[in-house]
């Protein structure tokens, strides 16, 4: 299941806000992340291992388990000379690379969708298990949500109109920081 789009808001949505936004015919999925600087001079956007939408494709190794394992984007690994079993360090914490993955919503590694060139040398994406993700302080979380349409759009015009409805609903409920429908990604 690949998202139809995602958005980021300033503060975590509460149940009432999620319910209101979902009334436009979507299902919302938490897709929170942190941006973690590593000692090798790079930054990884770290997500909790996804279960329902934008699920990882394991290219080699295994998905991370425990609190010291991390699976990283294959292209980021290649460009930084990293392989399964290597150690990455961030803020004094050592992470063992358990696997190399691809995330369907990051086929090109843009840290910001306004960038004109993707950067798989300095930026990458990664996943960690729920118990590892829970160790990040809440004030570091970026509140991103992915959505799927309850009834998929029939044509490009409907794709754009439905995305506009989602954006309007989010704007009525929260402070929108970014909004990326699939057709712009």
Residue ranges and their predicted role:
Residues 1-185:
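Membrane transport/envelope proteins' first extracytoplasmic loop
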């Amino acid at each position: 299941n690949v998202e139809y789009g995602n958005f980021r808001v300033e503060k975590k949505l509460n149940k009432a806000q999620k319910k209101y936004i979902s009334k436009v015919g979507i299902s919302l999925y938490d897709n929170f992340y942190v941006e973690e600087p590593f000692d090798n001079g790079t930054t990884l956007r770290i997500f909790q291992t996804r279960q329902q939408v934008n699920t990882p494709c394991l290219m080699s190794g295994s998905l991370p388990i425990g609190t010291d394992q991390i699976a990283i984007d294959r292209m980021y690994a290649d460009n930084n000379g990293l392989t399964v079993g290597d150690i990455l360090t961030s803020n004094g914490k050592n992470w063992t690379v358990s696997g190399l993955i691809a995330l369907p919503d990051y086929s090109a590694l843009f840290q910001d969708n306004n960038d004109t060139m993707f950067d798989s040398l300095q930026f990458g994406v990664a996943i960690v298990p729920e118990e590892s993700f829970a160790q990040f302080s809440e004030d570091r979380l970026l509140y991103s949500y992915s959505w799927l349409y309850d009834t998929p759009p029939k044509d490009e015009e409907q794709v754009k109109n439905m995305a506009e409805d989602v954006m309007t609903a989010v704007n009525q409920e929260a402070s929108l920081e970014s909004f990326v429908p699939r057709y712009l990604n």
